[in-house]
Curated annotation (Swiss-Prot):
S-adenosyl-L-methionine binds at residues 35-37, 55, 79, 101, 108. GO terms for cellular component: cytoplasm. The gene is rsmH. This is Ribosomal RNA small subunit methyltransferase H. It holds the Pfam family Methyltransf_5. Disulfide bonds: none annotated.
Length: 315
């Protein structure tokens, strides 16, 4: 596979800075991609520092093999399994920082053979890991209109989900779709209104990709795993690219950073509350950032990104 696709890492310095790196500590890049964050982390680690990286994309694993550094190790698999991978290395509760850069990467979008983009014709695949699971074409060929509409509405917030789903099923009864441009044209024809600022297939392609890769479930499992993997005082740095991702991250941090949930109106002193309601906070929210106008100008794909930080509290 050609790797001539340019990739500019979004919020590169900010995400790494948010880890509060210590030279001889252990870090985890849960989404290696093409290694922008990993390379910057390695440049700041000392001789005893270690960096583990995870990615389920075989092309990312191939790119990672170009890093010849004894402090670095790449793991092929989903980031949702980070707790399992770190347990195998006796590192549960010992990792000082985790970075997650969610969603699809520019090389994946720009490579027509991956099937993520409606702007370039290619096989209708959309799998992050091309070695397993069903492709988008395979799923669309056997899914009902009701199931397709639910996916488009739930993961793409597509207001014409039912019309588009019915058109897909009707087309596939005649001849199953196998190409991205074919699907994009069908969605455009089925959409009664056009947004001049957005291609009519944008939301549907996002929704199908999220469903095929179980992206939101993967994020939920990864965030839960991060709590187990992080050492006390360890930092979590997460970049999201659309509202569904960011909502999960925001809710997770909020859920684990709230103090004791005490029913309102109880006639208790602070000392009594402390004695009866255990403080179960596991995280401390540590800030939020968005890209600068300059970064958005240089890299328009950064426009929707949000970076959130959290810190694991000592027990």
């Amino acid at each position: 596979m050609s790797e001539n696709y340019l990739h500019t890492t979004v919020l590169l310095d900010e995400a790494v800075k948010g880890l509060n790196l210590r030279p001889d500590s252990v870090y985890l890049d849960g989404t290696f991609g093409r290694g922008g964050h990993s390379r910057l982390i390695l440049s700041k680690l000392g001789a005893q520092g270690r960096l583990f990286a995870i990615d389920r994309d075989p092309a990312a694993i191939e790119a990672a093999r170009a890093i010849e550094d004894a402090r670095f190790a790449i793991i092929h698999g989903p980031f949702s399994a980070m707790a399992e991978y770190m347990a195998q290395r006796d590192l549960l509760g010992k990792v000082d920082g985790i970075l997650l850069d969610l969603g699809v990467s520019s090389p994946q979008l720009d490579d027509p053979e991956r099937g993520f983009s409606f702007m370039r014709d290619g096989p209708l695949d959309m799998r992050m890991d091309t070695t397993r699971g069903q492709s988008a074409a395979q799923w669309l060929a056997q899914a009902s209109a009701e199931d397709i509409a639910w996916v488009l509405k739930t993961f793409g917030e597509e207001r014409f989900a039912k019309r588009i789903a019915q058109a897909i099923v009707a087309h596939n009864r005649q001849q199953p779709m196998t190409r991205t441009r074919e699907l994009a044209a069908l969605i455009a024809d089925a959409s009664p209104f056009r947004d001049k600022h957005k291609h009519p297939a944008t939301r549907s392609f996002q929704a199908i990709r999220i469903y095929i890769n179980s992206e939101l479930e993967e994020i939920e499992r990864a965030l839960d795993g991060a709590l187990t993997v992080l050492a006390p005082g360890g930092r979590l740095s997460v970049i999201s690219f659309h509202s569904l991702e960011d909502r999960l991250v925001k809710q997770f941090i909020r859920q684990h950073s709230r103090g004791p949930q005490v029913p309102a109106g109880l006639p208790l002193t602070e000392a009594q509350i402390a004695a009866q309601y255990q403080d179960q906070r596991l995280l401390k929210a540590a800030g939020k950032m968005q890209p600068s106008a300059r970064e958005i100008s240089d890299n328009p794909r950064a426009r929707s990104s949000v970076l959130r930080f959290a810190e694991k509290l000592a027990p």
